[in-house]
A protein has these predicted regions:
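Short alpha-helical elements
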Residues: 1-200
């Protein structure tokens, strides 16, 4: 409760969403792992298969965490965006990678005042996109930098947990520690006033 009320940032109208795997053990030790039996699941990320959980994050353009959700490793990245509690402070543009592509999800969020902006897959038809949105999509790497700092500086991922509660406390402590960083990854941008649309 303290983390979500006192340590979270405020939405600026430009937000980024992403998920990152939280591995609880090496793949070769999955069958031997007893601590997370029945809770952790096998999932797949851009880096391959893993056993553990996912940390879903929404940040603003200043690198401040707006909300987070911990799920099992096999959860679809789009599922948290269907939860009203996960998006209750979010408005404006929400930028995500291709894993968030969903026409139905886009329409649901649009009704709630959130414009979900994603890239397109290779075999999809080109879609019209404003130059501003195209530029902001290229700056989406800021949330990947946040994930990197959470893992490498705040140490939210390691394989030495002796209980599930210890695992959760470690993640929450890491997120709280990050919120007090004096300098966070952020983006600089200028709004381009144009009515032109670009094929993406």
């Amino acid at each position: 409760m303290f983390l979500k009320t006192c340590c979270s940032g405020s939405c600026t109208g430009i937000s980024f969403v992403d998920s990152t795997p939280i591995r609880v053990c090496k793949n070769k030790r999955i069958k031997a792992n007893k601590v997370f039996k029945g809770t952790a699941e096998i999932g797949k990320s851009t880096m391959g298969w893993f056993y553990g959980f996912k940390l879903h994050l929404i940040i603003n353009d200043r690198g401040e965490i707006l909300n987070f959700l911990i799920s099992q490793g096999n959860m679809d990245d789009r599922e948290p965006l269907k939860k009203e509690s996960f998006l209750k402070k979010i408005f404006g543009k929400l930028f995500g990678d291709k894993g968030y592509i969903s026409k139905q999800l886009f329409e649901i969020l649009f009704i709630d005042g959130i414009h979900l902006v994603t890239g397109i897959r290779n075999k999809m038809k080109n879609s019209l996109m404003s130059m501003n949105d195209k530029i902001m999509l290229r700056k989406r790497s800021v949330i990947e930098t946040v994930n990197d700092e959470l893992k490498n500086i705040c140490q939210i991922e390691h394989s030495r947990h002796r209980s599930f509660i210890n695992f959760i406390v470690n993640i929450l402590a890491g997120l709280a520690a990050y919120s007090f960083f004096p300098k966070k990854p952020s983006i600089k941008y200028q709004t381009v006033k144009t009515n032109q649309l670009y094929a993406f």
